[in-house]
Amino acid sequence: EMAGGAYPVICLMPNTPVAVGAGVVQYYGVDTTEEELSDFQTLLSAAGMIDRIDPERLNAASAVSGCGPAFCAVFIEALADGGVACGLPRDKALAYAAKMVEGTAQLMLENHAHPGQLKDGVCSPGGTTIQGVRTLEDRGFRSAVIEAVIAAYEKTIALGK
């Protein structure tokens, strides 16, 4: 209204990994044509995954993929800290942790595998990995991640009011 007419608008939420072509951008159009939205998607394709989303889901998507890089960075840092505590040099621990996250994500996406399936494929009965997973579960790792996403979502809603 302030602009004096109806103009096409594309609302989007990119995340920081778009800087290296491995990001996620959710978007929706207001007063846009399918051709404009298609052109937009083509224009941004080098940024990573470009996903058209219902407007009412943008805040939830932002909590997962917009805030997710920070959550993932905390996980990578903690994993590296554990490696340092076990005797690895910091630079190697960080490199191993980051590459492991990248590779696990790639494996999941390329094989269309559920994360639980990948976890189960690494956990040998009575082995080291299942003991680590047990510790993560005992310490509330899964719940902490879920609550972090919900907190980010709720803050996004509050900021929009």
Model features per residue range: what roles?
Residues V9, L58-A63, P115-D120:
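Short pre-catalytic strand/loop immediately N-terminal to key active-site residues, enriched for Gly-Thr
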Residues A98-K161:
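NAD(P)-dependent Rossmann-like dehydrogenase/reductase catalytic/cofactor-binding core
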